[in-house]
Amino acid sequence: MSKSKMIVRTKFIDRACHWTVVICFFLVALSGISFFFPTLQWLTQTFGTPQMGRILHPFFGIAIFVALMFMFVRFVHHNIPDKKDIPWLLNIVEVLKGNEHKVADVGKYNAGQKMMFWSIMSMIFVLLVTGVIIWRPYFAQYFPMQVVRYSLLIHAAAGIILIHAILIHMYMAFWVKGSIKGMIEGKVSRRWAKKHHPRWYREIEKAEAKKESEEGI
């Protein structure tokens, strides 16, 4: 039986969740930036009006948190750091040259992707906690003013860090040819998988061989 040239990397439900986060994050990031930079208040028009921006910003933030927690449960087992990540980190120059397949035996996600995963998850947790504390008119009145002020600063810092992390994530997605297509269509070529994630590709081949054996092909 001939093998398909394409293999599934990301299931539909995970892709749908990912792009939902992308859309919501775009809206929340723009409105959040406008709150701290008055000259950019026009960015709140992404929600229609400045008033609607302030009202909807936290609700969309909650939506992002829920979606990311779903993704956390789905992907955390693939993002546990281990000693096999060390060669990737030690040879980062070669990785940036596109030679990661020569220096590291990468699984489904490389060390950089794992760091991105934990950065995003930790920042969204900080944003949730501080966001609830500063959320008027629902929760802010239950906290001392000093706590609200510090939470506002921490919320802003976490937001800036997360925005930068997402920008790096976007850049890397464009830099590694085939990544975006894989997240849109859910499939990548065997050649792509073998080059960028050889250990994961071997696991796929092993699973395919086992399935064929069980089916008596």
Curated annotation (Swiss-Prot):
Topological domain ranges for the Periplasmic compartment? 37-52, 135-150
Kindly state which keywords UniProt assigns to this record, in alphabetical order.
Cell inner membrane, Cell membrane, Electron transport, Heme, Iron, Membrane, Metal-binding, Transmembrane, Transmembrane helix, Transport
Record: residues binding heme b 1:
H18, H169
A GO molecular function for this record?
Answer: metal ion binding
Q: Which cofactor names does the annotation list?
A: heme
Q: Does the keyword Zinc apply?
A: no
Instruction: Indicate which residues the UniProt annotation says bind a menaquinone.
Output: H169
| Coiled-coil portions | none
User: Which conditions up-regulate this protein?
Assistant: By nitrate under anaerobic conditions.
Q: Which family does it belong to?
A: Belongs to the formate dehydrogenase gamma subunit family.
Q: By what name is this protein known?
A: Formate dehydrogenase, nitrate-inducible, cytochrome b556(Fdn) subunit
Q: Which organism is it from?
A: Escherichia coli (strain K12)
Taxonomy, top ranks, is: Bacteria, Pseudomonadati, Pseudomonadota, Gammaproteobacteria, Enterobacterales
Q: Which gene encodes it?
A: fdnI
